[in-house]
Regions:
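Short Fe-S-cluster ligation motifs
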Residues: 42-61, 65, 255, 283
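Short, cysteine/histidine-rich loop/knuckle motifs that typically chelate Zn2+
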Residues: 20, 208, 250
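Flexible mid-to-C-terminal extensions adjoining Fe-S/redox cofactors in radical SAM and related proteins
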Residues: 1, 11, 24, 28, ...
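N-terminal pre-triad scaffold of radical SAM enzymes
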Residues: 1-24, 55-59, 211-219
Length: 283
């Protein structure tokens, strides 16, 4: 059975300082970084020993690709025949040479543009470098009021073949977006409404806990990042007996890496083959 794993280790540092993010300009101690690297190496070793097909998305609390151990893990995992996809969420601030050693048939990047931290021109140059190398990727932004024009400018500057997604600004008051703004944003990302006003989740079918799992640095397995109940451990194999169909226990799920795994919503079809990296099937 194919498993999709969302890995989030101990890393909690970022080189950017976005004012809405709790991890802005935070720093990990050398000891914390060493432990994170050790944990990640253990996870890669586990994946190397598997025979079942796997897909992996790294969802760090911060920026992973500025750390060599994440770049090396991406390269190593991309070489495994059992890996369908390895992807990571990134601000795309690092150089590209590490990609030379990767198998680009299996690697993808989920890229976020932060206008307060980097110029549009610089970010677009990095996107062009990805296209030149043939790296599969998506591009997106947080849809803050201050960035409405920038969102449209970025979309206009990107080729139609580059998918662009949007996350609703959070936290926000109920009337944060006008109907006209929602229409503008939905023209950029037709799925924006699911992030803005997700349908109720409690009791809804979900692939998490069955074929999609969350893994932390200790190897503790949970069904997703938003349900804290452990299902066992990755490394002793105890999680395997807990894999089964489950409905969502939460009243609301407003994050793509959660609700995209609901089969009653359009994402499994619309993003077939690209759910983890947020690339639609038509891209």
């Amino acid at each position: 059975m194919h498993l999709s794993l969302l890995y989030r280790g101990r890393l909690s540092s970022c080189n950017y300082a976005c004012d809405y993010c709790p991890f802005a300009k935070t720093y990990d101690s050398p000891a914390a970084l060493r432990r994170d690297a050790q944990d990640l190496a253990r996870f890669v070793g586990w994946a190397q020993a598997q025979t079942r097909p796997l897909s992996i998305l790294f969802t760090p609390w911060g920026e992973g690709l500025v750390r060599r151990h994440y770049r090396e893990a991406m390269v190593q995992l991309s070489q495994l025949p059992q890996l369908r996809r390895v992807a990571i969420q990134t601000n795309l601030c690092t150089g590209m040479r590490w990609l030379d050693a990767a198998n680009l048939d299996r690697l993808a990047l989920w890229c976020t543009y932060h206008p307060s931290q980097v110029t549009r021109a610089a970010f677009l140059r990095r996107c062009q470098a990805l296209r030149d190398r043939g790296v599969r990727h998506s591009v997106g932004m947080v849809a803050a009021h201050a960035h409405m024009d920038e969102i449209e400018a970025l979309r206009a500057a990107l080729p139609d073949t580059t998918p662009m997604w949007l996350n609703a600004f959070d936290p926000r008051p109920p009337d944060y977006y006008t109907p006209e703004q929602v229409q503008r944003l939905s023209r950029i990302d037709p799925h924006f409404s699911y992030n803005l006003a997700p349908p109720p989740s409690f009791g809804a079918p979900c692939l998490t806990g069955e074929s999609v799992l969350s893994v932390d640095g200790d190897g503790t397995v949970r069904r997703c990042h938003f349900v804290d109940t452990p299902l066992g451990n990755l490394y002793d194999g105890s999680f395997a007996t807990q894999l089964r169909t489950r409905s969502c226990p939460n009243a609301r799920c407003d994050c793509f890496i959660g609700y995209a795994h609901r089969p009653d919503l359009p994402f499994q079809a619309d993003y077939a083959g690209g759910v983890l990296e947020r690339v639609p099937a038509t891209a």
